[in-house]
């Protein structure tokens, strides 16, 4: 171990091992993890949560959220869960997780009430927006996007993680913070065996933690930093927090877990040094919907409904078109327009230029009605993740007044940056772990929730699937006896953890992360062929055999960062294998094979799942509707939960 340039402020405990025992182990204490802990506790299980940061602000949503999507059972919704999840599936041409999104639509409102019960703010209790058309006067709920159908709720998400942590602790969950899970343990140490616990490391002391568990729930978000990483500014390399590094993906792959849709990656948006801060430049989407836009000469940009009808008022931007039941915005909407589900939008940039509009464009809140202006620059920007301090506070202190000033758009039209085709990221509904109706993976004893699942998205989805996976894991834990750890496997994991301490100054974690992104951009970018992908696997394998073995750590912090980059390397390998397995191009998946140019041929309109074997990698095709009848299967698997709700 090379010396640190400054004294390490915590005691070093590399030689110590803490052993714990529980019924349900939750890995990751973000939105999904906190709810998984609550769900498992509600089902009577002992619960330990392993979180590598401080839970009160950890995870992809730790810095806030501005809306709760798809709350189809809230008292004001005019859309039922079956309608909404059917639309979400059709919006993505079937490439969606029907199980997890049905859970989201069916149970999301329940979870929002759980957060409110723990003092999270979900209503306009201060009566700041009395009389606004997006407010329901009886419930004091505020709605976003579709004001007619009211299934997306504006929330004060800055209060949510505090509330979730309180709620889980009140139920009896034990949180072990600043400790990263680094490896899963299996019965008898067997590849593909039942999962019986995990190993982790404390990022301050370096102490190893070994936890034996009857069931384990993975809640560590989606991977980042696979195609995008800036050595000089690692904290803004990706849209999501940089510590979201695919830990669940990598740990579970190493023991035989199955994944799908990881071939889907879109051209990057809102990330790194090519981009202005997300939602900090002029735009009209998501948190800023439906802000008025103007061109360089002050001409207002027209808003159109799905039929091309120009909308005369701001109010119409939040309403379905004549004859349209509802539209999708704010989570789950399609990447490519679907007529039945398309909501109001501004005229496309290429058409604007043809009509003589001048770049750059600007977001002009001063032209919005006062209530709309305050709810965007206040509730939305004030509560969305990464917005409160770097945008709301910083811009206000710099003198920005939304009633007077405009914000410029950058990149392509209203977007905040411009990227090269090979610069990709997991955005929208990416791939992840395959799941059944218990949110169990293909490995016994291993469950997943939130962004660890395939086709996942948003805060409400994370919370709903977290609680669901937690209670099903608890049910399983009650049915099994004690589990035993395989000590040679534990020692192997410990040796792997501390190996970088013995290296001289060679390769840093930043250098390895940057090298991974170069390989992925060159061999798994916008266009793919078998030859490129095979060479990509070889290049990643070379990085693992050579550079990864020379990684050097100065302290426990470095050990954590090294484990993250090793997880990125493993996840990158899964991605390339997923791309190799799909022998067809796909519009919906943003997937282009030069050697298989046919777009979505019928025989490939299926999920392609990959998993490691002891001799290589296996793949199989799974029907897009493998989940069967959604309401029937849900009710069959959740009778106890539904009965408990009826008794309330």
Model regions and ranges:
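Extreme N-terminal leader/targeting segments of oxidoreductases
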Residues: 1-24
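Core beta-strand elements of the Rossmann-like FAD/NAD(P) dinucleotide-binding domain
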Residues: 19-22, 205-215, 442
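N-terminal Rossmann-like FAD-binding beta1-loop-alpha1 element of flavoenzymes
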Residues: 24-49
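Glycine-rich FAD pyrophosphate-binding loop
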Residues: 42-62
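Mobile, glycine/GP-rich and aromatic-enriched active-site lid/loop segments adjacent to catalytic centers
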Residues: 109, 117-183, 188-194, 261-454, ...
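Conserved beta-strand-loop-beta-strand element in the redox core of flavoprotein oxidoreductases
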Residues: 186-209, 216
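Glycine-rich loop(s) and the adjacent beta-strand/alpha-helix scaffold that form part
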Residues: 218-279, 459-473
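Long, amphipathic alpha-helical stalk/connector segments used for oligomerization, subunit docking
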Residues: 478-557
């Amino acid at each position: 171990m090379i010396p640190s340039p400054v004294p390490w402020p915590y005691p070093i405990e590399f030689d110590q091992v803490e052993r714990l025992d529980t019924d349900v182990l939750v890995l990751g204490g973000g939105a999904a993890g906190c709810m998984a802990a609550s769900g498992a506790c509600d089902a009577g299980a002992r619960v330990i949560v392993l979180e590598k940061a401080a839970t009160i602000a950890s995870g992809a949503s730790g810095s806030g959220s501005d809306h709760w999507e798809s709350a189809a059972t809230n008292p004001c919704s005019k859309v039922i869960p079956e309608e909404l999840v059917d639309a979400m599936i059709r919006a993505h041409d079937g490439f969606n997780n029907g199980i997890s999104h049905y859970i989201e639509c069916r149970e999301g409102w329940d979870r929002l009430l759980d957060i409110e019960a723990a003092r999270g703010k979900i209503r306009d209790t201060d009566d700041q927006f009395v009389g606004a058309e997006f407010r329901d006067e009886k419930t004091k709920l505020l709605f976003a996007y579709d004001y007619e159908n009211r299934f997306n709720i504006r929330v004060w998400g800055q209060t949510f993680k505090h509330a979730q942590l309180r709620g889980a602790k009140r139920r009896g969950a034990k949180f072990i913070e600043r400790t990263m899970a680094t490896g899963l343990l299996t019965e008898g140490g067997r590849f593909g065996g039942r999962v019986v616990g995990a190993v982790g490391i404390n990022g301050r002391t370096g102490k190893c933690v070994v936890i034996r568990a009857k069931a384990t729930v993975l809640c560590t978000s989606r991977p980042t930093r696979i195609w995008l990483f800036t050595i000089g500014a690692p904290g803004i390399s990706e849209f999501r927090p940089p510590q979201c590094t695919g830990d669940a993906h990598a740990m579970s792959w190493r023991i035989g877990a199955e994944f799908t849709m990881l071939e889907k990656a879109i051209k990057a948006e809102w990330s790194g040094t090519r981009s202005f801060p997300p939602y900090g430049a002029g735009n009209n989407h998501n948190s800023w919907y439906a802000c008025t836009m103007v061109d360089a000469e002050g001409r207002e940009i027209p808003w159109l409904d799905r039929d091309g009808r120009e909308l005369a008022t701001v109010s119409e931007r939040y309403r379905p078109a004549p004859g349209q039941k509802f539209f999708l915005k704010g989570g789950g909407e399609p990447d490519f327009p679907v007529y039945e589900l398309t909501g109001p939008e501004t005229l496309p940039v290429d058409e604007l230029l043809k009509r003589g509009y001048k770049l750059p464009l600007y977001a002009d809140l001063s032209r919005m009605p006062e209530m709309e202006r305050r709810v965007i620059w206040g509730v939305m920007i004030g509560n969305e993740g990464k917005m409160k301090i770097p945008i709301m506070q910083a811009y206000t202190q710099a003198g920005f007044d939304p009633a007077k000033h405009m914000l410029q758009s950058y990149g392509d039209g209203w977007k905040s940056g411009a990227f090269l085709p090979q610069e990709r990221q997991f955005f929208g509904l990416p791939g992840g772990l395959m799941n059944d109706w218990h949110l169990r993976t293909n490995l016994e004893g291993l469950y997943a929730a939130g962004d660890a699942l395939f086709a996942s998205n948003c805060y409400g989805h994370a919370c709903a699937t977290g609680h669901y996976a937690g209670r099903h894991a608890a049910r399983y834990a009650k049915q099994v006896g004690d589990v035993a750890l395989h000590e040679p496997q534990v020692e192997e994991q410990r040796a792997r953890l501390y190996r970088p301490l013995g290296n001289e100054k060679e390769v840093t974690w930043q250098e390895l992360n940057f090298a991974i992104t170069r390989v992925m951009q060159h061999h798994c970018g916008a266009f793919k062929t078998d030859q490129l992908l095979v060479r990509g696997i070889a290049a990643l394998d070379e990085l693992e055999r050579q550079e990864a073995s020379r990684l050097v750590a100065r302290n426990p912090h470095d050990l954590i960062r090294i484990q993250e980059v090793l997880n990125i390397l493993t996840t990158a390998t899964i991605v390339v294998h997923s791309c190799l397995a799909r022998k067809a191009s796909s519009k919906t998946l943003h997937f282009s094979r030069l050697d298989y140019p046919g777009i979505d041929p019928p025989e490939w309109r299926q999920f392609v799942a990959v998993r490691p074997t002891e001799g290589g990698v296996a793949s199989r095709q799974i029907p897009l509707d493998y989940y069967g009848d959604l309401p029937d299967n849900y009710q069959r698997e959740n009778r106890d939960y539904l009965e408990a709700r009826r008794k309330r």
